Amino acid sequence: MAISLKVLAPNQNVYEGDAEEVILPSTTGQIGVLPGHISLVTAIDIGVLRLRMNSKWKSIALMGGFAEIESDEVIVLVNSAEIGSEINIQNAEDALKKAKSAISKFPENEKSSEKIKALNEVSKAEARIQASKN
């Protein structure tokens, strides 16, 4: 028995297919989904969605959004996403260095919107790197 998985971003249908298992990065921690899962709506954090099909794992970098789980169907609506195998790791590593450099310019206890944006950029780059390695 498989789960029907759809990952949708505003400008693209990122992934549509079956999976034996899905692991989602929710804002409260990872959620593992198997066929017959209880119904649930959750906020998705910046992170990596993992799906298993035919004993092989695939990763998708997610940039925040929402997910709806209904028994054997998972629909993920995100701001943006990238299939791990399509990510240029060098670009992701360069983005991580740039974001970390931007953070280092702020005092440690500062909570400005610019610093929060830089912290988000670090999270996005880390998610892209992690997804590209799986």
Curated annotation (Swiss-Prot):
Glycosyltransferase listed as a keyword: no
InterPro entries: ATP_synth_F1_dsu/esu (IPR001469), ATP_synth_F1_dsu/esu_N (IPR020546), ATPsynth_dsu/esu_N (IPR036771)
Localization per Swiss-Prot or TrEMBL: Cellular thylakoid membrane
Gene from which the chain derives: atpC
Entry function: Produces ATP from ADP in the presence of a proton gradient across the membrane.
Source organism, top-level taxon: Bacteria
Name the record gives this protein: ATP synthase epsilon chain
Source species of the chain: Prochlorococcus marinus subsp. pastoris (strain CCMP1986 / NIES-2087 / MED4)
Annotated GO MF terms: ATP binding; proton-transporting ATP synthase activity, rotational mechanism
